């Protein structure tokens, strides 16, 4: 028996009266329709209204019968995100502060590149991982987002882009929260945005980043979906990584590397390691050599990230010349490495700066 309300998969999910229609995968919509005496092909029509025509209400789905629309309204809600603040950076990056149905707030970022528009989505209200350089974890974890709330972030940004005939071409799951701590909803989200009948964003244009939740890395290796995979590493030894990322005390670097090796053997896909450079902490050439030794046998890429200022944190940015030296040393040792282009730091939209808290800023 298919029910309209999915079983709650963890205690951190909200308990809303109705499920978001955006949380349903295509096959779940088909099953629901059959259960309610409808034909499966209606699922394609509904998904077209949701993701191609991007309507704001079920009543606008005019090729569905009135009775079906009423049943849909009785069972589902169309998740809407209220834009509380919208800020635009000098480089064109746009940060959205969205209010959720229960009053919590999250942040989502639109980044513009030569190759297209990328959206950085949030998967949790807050975060409990506790990285000592990150703003997202300052208030702790409030709750997980439903798949529909993650989908709605992309849809809301896409509706903004519709005004200029642009589209979201890439998604990075690197906003507030640890995606692998909201694994089932994240996977539903990935499938929904990847469907031909959904937002139709290619799997290879989607990247998920984790701080290193080892059991979920093994799970992710078994998924039949070619999503890009990134790991926030930031140090190549347990002493420094545990100071930067307390999660390392539970999942040591040795265990993390075992899981990553398994993922690579299973999927034959390249891994991206994200390495934030913190002045005087992990940015010396000895650290570069240590990193190169750790990952030398992996098919991987290192994304070097200049640390961004967070008022509550005491880390300082590594000087540019030292960042270039670090990159050069990695390349000398045979490691593919690039320096991430900094975007949105003037509106606190860059790596490590997102938080689920409204600020007194001008809406632009």
Swiss-Prot record:
Positions bound to [4Fe-4S] cluster: 127, 131, 134
All copies of domain Radical SAM core, residue ranges: 113-346
Record: residues binding S-adenosyl-L-methionine: 177-178, 209, 232-234, 308
GO molecular function list: 4 iron, 4 sulfur cluster binding; metal ion binding; rRNA (adenine(2503)-C2-)-methyltransferase activity; rRNA binding; tRNA (adenine(37)-C2)-methyltransferase activity; tRNA binding
Enzyme Commission number, as recorded: 2.1.1.192
Reactions it catalyzes: adenosine(2503) in 23S rRNA + 2 reduced [2Fe-2S]-[ferredoxin] + 2 S-adenosyl-L-methionine = 2-methyladenosine(2503) in 23S rRNA + 5'-deoxyadenosine + L-methionine + 2 oxidized [2Fe-2S]-[ferredoxin] + S-adenosyl-L-homocysteine; adenosine(37) in tRNA + 2 reduced [2Fe-2S]-[ferredoxin] + 2 S-adenosyl-L-methionine = 2-methyladenosine(37) in tRNA + 5'-deoxyadenosine + L-methionine + 2 oxidized [2Fe-2S]-[ferredoxin] + S-adenosyl-L-homocysteine
An annotated GO cellular component: cytoplasm
Cofactor entry: [4Fe-4S] cluster
UniProt keyword Kinase, yes or no: no
Cofactor: how bound: Binds 1 [4Fe-4S] cluster. The cluster is coordinated with 3 cysteines and an exchangeable S-adenosyl-L-methionine.
Key words of the record: 4Fe-4S, Antibiotic resistance, Cytoplasm, Disulfide bond, Iron, Iron-sulfur, Metal-binding, Methyltransferase, rRNA processing, S-adenosyl-L-methionine, Transferase, tRNA processing
Compartments, as annotated in UniProt: Cytoplasm
Active site residues according to the UniProt entry: 107, 351
Covalent S-S links between cysteines: 120-351
GO biological process: response to antibiotic; rRNA base methylation; tRNA methylation
Class of enzymatic activity (EC top level): transferase
Chief localization: cytoplasm
UniProt miscellaneous comment: Reaction proceeds by a ping-pong mechanism involving intermediate methylation of a conserved cysteine residue.
Family that this chain belongs to: Belongs to the radical SAM superfamily. RlmN family.
Function noted in UniProt: Specifically methylates position 2 of adenine 2503 in 23S rRNA and position 2 of adenine 37 in tRNAs. Confers resistance to some classes of antibiotics.
Protein name in UniProt: Probable dual-specificity RNA methyltransferase RlmN
Organism: Staphylococcus carnosus (strain TM300)
Top-level taxonomy: Bacteria, Bacillati, Bacillota, Bacilli, Bacillales
Gene designation per UniProt: rlmN
